[in-house]
């Protein structure tokens, strides 16, 4: 064996040892890793400290360009009437006669998700927290879910 062969054997042995050490480290800390992931799962697609948005680019949705958590659209349980889509901007709205707006309600969570995150741009928004109805029940509910 020449010196070059010995050098490559030493490098390969060191690399294999490092892989075993990393594997053992993951094995020993697996419970802590799962706990960390569960704790920070809510921040998976939020803006990172470095300023680069961490986005799920596989599916385009309305929350992809938003980094403020309160501005992100979400489906929440509406008291007694199914589900609604809400954000700091208000609720997804249904436009009735005379251009009156009311909260769009869904029977199931899946219907709410399908409507909120569909490819169609939903621009009808009803915000119950604008004057003069700042203290109504709908505004209080919106503030409570944000």
Curated annotation (Swiss-Prot):
<comment type="subunit">
    <text>Part of a stable entry-fusion complex (EFC) which is at least composed of proteins OPG143, OPG147, OPG155, OPG086, OPG094, OPG107, OPG104, and OPG099. Formation of the viral membrane is necessary for the assembly of the complex. Interacts directly with protein OPG107.</text>
</comment>
<keyword id="KW-1162">Viral penetration into host cytoplasm</keyword>
<feature type="topological domain" description="Virion surface">
    <location>
        <begin position="22"/>
        <end position="146"/>
    </location>
</feature>
<keyword id="KW-1168">Fusion of virus membrane with host membrane</keyword>
<comment type="function">
    <text>Envelope protein required for virus entry into host cell and for cell-cell fusion (syncytium formation).</text>
</comment>
<keyword id="KW-0426">Late protein</keyword>
<dbReference type="GO" id="GO:0019031">
    <property type="term" value="C:viral envelope"/>
</dbReference>
<dbReference type="InterPro" id="IPR007664">
    <property type="entry name" value="Poxvirus_A28"/>
</dbReference>
<feature type="transmembrane region" description="Helical; Signal-anchor for type II membrane protein">
    <location>
        <begin position="1"/>
        <end position="21"/>
    </location>
</feature>
<comment type="similarity">
    <text>Belongs to the orthopoxvirus OPG155 protein family.</text>
</comment>
<keyword id="KW-0946">Virion</keyword>
<dbReference type="GO" id="GO:0016020">
    <property type="term" value="C:membrane"/>
</dbReference>
<keyword id="KW-1160">Virus entry into host cell</keyword>
<keyword id="KW-0261">Viral envelope protein</keyword>
<dbReference type="GO" id="GO:0039663">
    <property type="term" value="P:membrane fusion involved in viral entry into host cell"/>
</dbReference>
<keyword id="KW-1133">Transmembrane helix</keyword>
<keyword id="KW-0735">Signal-anchor</keyword>
<dbReference type="Pfam" id="PF04584">
    <property type="entry name" value="Pox_A28"/>
</dbReference>
<keyword id="KW-1015">Disulfide bond</keyword>
<keyword id="KW-0472">Membrane</keyword>
<dbReference type="GO" id="GO:0055036">
    <property type="term" value="C:virion membrane"/>
</dbReference>
<protein>
    <recommendedName>
        <fullName>Envelope protein OPG155</fullName>
    </recommendedName>
</protein>
<keyword id="KW-0812">Transmembrane</keyword>
<dbReference type="GO" id="GO:0046718">
    <property type="term" value="P:symbiont entry into host cell"/>
</dbReference>
<keyword id="KW-0597">Phosphoprotein</keyword>
């Amino acid at each position: 064996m020449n010196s070059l062969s010995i050098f490559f054997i030493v490098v390969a042995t060191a690399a294999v040892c490092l892989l075993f050490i990393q594997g053992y480290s993951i094995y020993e800390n697996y419970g802590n890793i799962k706990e960390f992931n569960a704790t920070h799962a809510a921040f998976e697609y939020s803006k990172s400290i470095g300023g680069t948005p961490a986005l799920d680019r596989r599916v385009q949705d309305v929350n992809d360009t938003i980094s403020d958590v309160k501005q992100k659209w979400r489906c929440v349980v509406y008291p007694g009437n199914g589900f609604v889509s809400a954000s700091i901007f208000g609720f997804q709205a249904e436009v009735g006669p005379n251009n009156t707006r009311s909260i769009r309600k869904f029977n199931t969570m899946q219907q709410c998700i399908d409507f909120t995150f569909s490819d169609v741009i939903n621009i009808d928004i009803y915000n119950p927290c604008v004057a003069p109805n700042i203290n109504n029940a709908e505004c209080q509910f919106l503030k409570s879910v944000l």
